[in-house]
C-alpha cells in the first residue's frame, strides 16, 4: 500500500482546539481506503509523540522550551529546526506522497530537500489561505491544491506545478447534525471563531445591542482568546464595547474542543458569520449548516461558492449589518426558516461529507502518482 505523509505546523493532529487545516488533515487521513496515512506535526502536551489512532500514524515533533528560548530566540540559530526534524521523519516513513498542509516558513527548501533525497516522491502543496509568495522559489512541486476556486483564481504568484486542483473542505455529516433537544426557551444567536480582528467579531456586539431590549434573545461568542498583544487588545476593545452599551445579553465563552463544537451549533438558533473579503472558504459555514443552525453571513467570494442567499442562508453587506439582521430575524417565519435550513443540510450531505472529500483526494493522488513526465 502506498504511503501519504501529511506535513503541518502550528497545531497538533488531531487538533485539540479549533484548527480547520488540521481538522481537514485528520478527517481525510482516517478515511483513506487506498493509502497508508501518516501525519507529521507539532506536539501537544496532551498527546504522545507517536500514536496510531483511527488508522492514522501520527508523528509529533517536540521542540523543548529551552531549545526555543536559547537557539531560536537568543542565538537566532535554529541548529536543529522543525523542518530538519520533519525531514528525518519523512526519511523514516519513506512515503510515496508528501502532502504539505498550508505554508509555513521554509517549506520550499524542505520540498527541495525531500526531492533531492528521493526524486520519486510526489510533493503536493495544499493552500487554505493567501500567502505572499513573490520571492519564494517553489521548483519541486508536483501539485498545488486550493480549498476554493476563488483562492485558485486569485492567488498571486501561485507556485509552478504540474497539476492544479480545487478540493473543498468538508464536514462530518453524521456528527454535525440536528440533535432534538432544546436547552431553554431563549433564542440563541452565536458566533464561533478566533477572537481576532479578521473575524469581525464587533458585528456580534452591535447585533446584541440591537436586541438589548428583547430578553428572549441571547448571544454567545465561542472562540480562542489569543493573548498576543494585538489580538488581546482587540478582545479588550470588544469587552469595553459590551460594558459601554451595558449589555447583559452576550457572553464570551473561551475555546471548546473540536469534538464538542457540534453541540455548540445545536445550541445556536442562528449562527452569525461576518466574513472578510480574503476568507477563502469558511468551514464554520458548512458546520453550522450541517447542524441546521440558520446561517446569517456577510459572505466572502470564497464562501459564496456554497453560500446562496435565500437558498441555504441569508446574506447581508456590512452596511447597517446589525439593523438589517435584526429586522430579518424578527420577521422570519417558520416555513421560510425550515426551507432554508433543510436546503443547507441537504447541500452539506451531497457536496461536503468527509467521505466525498476523501474520495476526491484519493482520485487526485492516483492521477499525480501515475504521472511519469519529467
PLM features: residue spans?
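N-terminal strand-loop element at the rim of the active site
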Residues: 8-13, 31-74, 227
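Nucleotide-activated donor-binding/catalytic signature segment of Leloir-type glycosyltransferases, i.e.
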Residues: 115-116, 232-256
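Carbohydrate-associated surface elements
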Residues: 150, 170
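Conserved donor-binding/catalytic core segment of Leloir-type glycosyltransferases
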Residues: 182-199, 205-209, 220
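Glycosyltransferase donor-sugar binding loop
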Residues: 218-236
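Short alpha-helical donor nucleotide-sugar binding micro-motif in glycosyltransferases
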Residues: 255, 264-268
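Short hydrophobic beta-strand element within catalytic cores of glycosyltransferases
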Residues: 294-297
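Conserved acidic donor-binding segment of nucleotide-sugar-dependent glycosyltransferases
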Residues: 309-320, 327-334
